[in-house]
Regions:
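Short, conserved catalytic/metal-binding motifs centered on acidic residues
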Residues: 5, 19-20, 45-49, 84-94, ...
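DNA-recognition alpha helix
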Residues: 19-32
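Electropositive, glycine- and tryptophan-enriched low-complexity nucleic-acid-binding patches
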Residues: 216-264
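Basic, amphipathic alpha-helical segments enriched in Lys/Arg and hydrophobic/aromatic residues
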Residues: 187-190, 259, 304-375
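Basic, short loop/linker segments at the boundary and entry of helix-turn-helix/winged-helix-like folds
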Residues: 1-4, 11
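Flexible, glycine/threonine-enriched loop-and-boundary segments that flank and lead into catalytic domains
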Residues: 203-220
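Active-site- or DNA-interface-adjacent structural scaffold in DNA-acting proteins
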Residues: 36-208
Length: 375
């Protein structure tokens, strides 16, 4: 049942709570999840889906993607020849965080330290609860009014408040617990990082978030992790997806993407079509022919030109993954959550294609061609 609920969740782009409610009112969803009779009670608590995802991990979620490919092969929707040519590209899976600013990081970090100190019964000299809130509000007002000197002064004041609280806790606690120790380490990184620092902290609750720039005019920076995607060139079936941390160069991810496809599908492609981000033959697999999009079309045959034109077909797949299958904003925690959400989104996309294939077959076999709707 939980397997079916997760397929439906990412196929229809709904939350854990909504998929459980939809199960209760939709007999087709109940039949898909294995029920023989209609039920009038919720199948489980939405938190059960969270616990189940943690238990199976990303290795278990990879089986979801593998099963959609196997089902497509059994039903004749995916031919073996399709695995010969694939398209590979990368995108950014954004994390569910607020846009990071220095003032917000100082303010939120101080609040987190004060809250944890209260749980541990640590008597702080001063918490700066009222002063910190007032300084944060003033900073936002001054910045909005383009009064940068006043805004920077309030930002510096927020940084001072955070440093005072951090040092006060360190003086009074010699052996902090794991949670408090982690917060103190994050606060130290926030206080010491500068504009040109590497591996900066952009979120308190998601310190693994990276800042990635893909050259988009409408969105200069994206905060999350890079995702590598492999699709078949002909029919756009997703045969591989990986969440990559550390913002690696696209060319360095190609071998791992092909290896994951081999793990999921059971065979390696013969030809791979990529964009200019994959330049550098040193990073390409030796047994796979890699076609870069910078090759002159005049020197291509008609057949080669046709397949090269199909490379851009992966772009709408990325858009569908984000806007239709829960990958535009990841709410799952940690790096493992990034991997799980990317795999579930890919499995949901393939499952939607299988549903469309089933209904098109149903309309073809059971509805007469002469049938017309009355207007």
């Amino acid at each position: 049942m939980l397997v079916g609920l997760h397929y439906l969740k990412h196929a229809y782009n709904v939350s854990d709570e909504r998929v459980v409610e939809g199960y209760l009112e939709n007999p087709y969803w109940q039949y898909f999840c294995g029920n023989e009779y209609f039920e009038h009670d919720l199948p489980c608590d939405p938190t059960s889906l969270v616990k189940w995802r943690k238990r199976i991990g990303s290795e278990g979620v990879e089986k979801f993607l593998e099963e959609t490919i196997l089902l497509g092969q059994r039903e004749g929707e995916i031919k073996d020849q399709e695995f010969r040519r694939v398209n590979v590209d990368t995108t950014v899976q954004e994390k569910a965080i607020a846009f990071p600013t220095d003032a917000r990081l100082y303010h939120k970090m101080r609040q987190a330290l004060v809250k944890e100190a209260s749980k541990e019964n640590i008597q702080l000299r001063q918490s700066y609860k009222r002063k910190g809130k007032l300084a944060f509000i003033k900073q936002g007002r001054y910045f909005h009014a383009k009064q940068s000197k006043r805004a920077n002064k309030e930002t510096k004041r927020l940084k001072t408040y955070l440093g005072c609280v951090k040092r006060d806790i360190e003086r009074k606690v010699e052996n902090p617990n794991i949670r408090l120790k982690s917060l103190l380490e994050i606060s130290e990184r926030i206080l010491t990082q500068t504009k040109n620092s590497k591996n900066k902290i952009y979120s308190i609750h998601a310190p693994e978030v990276e800042c990635i720039s893909k050259g988009k005019s409408h969105k200069r920076y994206e905060f999350g992790c890079k995702v590598s995607l492999v699709t078949t060139s002909k029919s756009n079936w997703i045969v591989g997806v990986q969440a990559l941390h550390g913002n690696p160069y696209d060319g360095h991810t190609l071998k791992d993407a092909i290896n994951q496809m081999e793990k999921v599908v059971g065979r390696r492609p013969k030809e791979v079509y990529v964009d200019l981000g994959y330049k550098g033959k040193d990073h390409h697999p030796e047994d796979v022919q890699v076609h870069l999009s910078n090759k002159s079309r005049k020197n291509m045959t008609r057949w080669e030109r046709m397949w090269m034109n199909r490379r851009s077909a992966i772009e709408p797949v990325i858009s569908h993954l984000k806007h239709d299958h829960n990958m535009i904003r990841n709410f799952l925690k940690g790096r493992e959550g990034d991997r799980i959400n990317a795999l579930f989104a890919a499995a949901g996309c393939n499952f939607s294609k299988l549903l469309r294939a089933f209904f098109s077959l149903f309309l073809k076999d059971y509805i007469s061609p002469s049938f017309s709707f009355a207007i």
